Amino acid sequence: MKTARAAVVAALAALALGATPSSPPVRVLVYTFTYTNFTTETIHDSGINAPAFHAPVSGVAESRAADSDLGTITVEVLRVQPDTGLIVSVAEDAHGHRSARPATCVVYGNTNVICDPDVRVNTEELSLLRLRGSNFVDTNQIDAKNHWRVDQSGNRMSDVADFSIDKNQDGMLKISSTRILRETDAIGFVSTTNGTISYDWGRLVPTSVVDDETIRQPGSLDRYSTVRTQTSLTLIRDSAAAKTP
């Protein structure tokens, strides 16, 4: 992991000095994306604090907000690290307000992504980058039921993702996924993401991704929020169909 962080630092230092890349990107991938987000704030009222001249009232009050966008995401593969990590640049061109300037990241087959902390990387960009590692589908990790698990839990966070290959047609894989991200303290949030992935095993690249994430976040007493985010991505251009960095 230190190697990955050092690679990001080195790449950012070169950009800061105005350095021009000595060679073009190894590979350029362009995806279309759609993004929708629904937030619901729920308040449970017991009626205990109602004024004396009113009868106690109990119930549930909800407020909702929605957001959406669409556009393209471009991933440039800059080089491959000795530890198999890929140094990439990712940028988003949205029709609405979610456009994001290029960010330098290192991606691994175990879904780990390390990006420049000073540049915003959107949810839909991360959904793609998590699957961009060269050995994302690793035969050494797949069990007899065509399933594998990635556990990246830490001291305060449980992060477990399960992947299952539902169909393999001449190297074109249909993969279902479930990721549960949970804070381990009593008031932490819980994120559950169900997804489907179309993956070209020959080119080592996802060709389409659909994620449906629900986050439940406790607030103050009798209050919590639910955020549902749906993203879809479809590969529309691959500059290196014959090369698989």
Predicted regions located by residue number:
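Hydrophobic h-region of N-terminal signal peptides that target proteins for export
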Residues: 9-20
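Short, flexible coil/linker elements and helix-boundary hinge sites characteristic
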Residues: 1, 16-18, 154
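Bacterial N-terminal signal peptides that target proteins for export
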Residues: 1-8
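Signature of exported/secreted
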Residues: 20-245
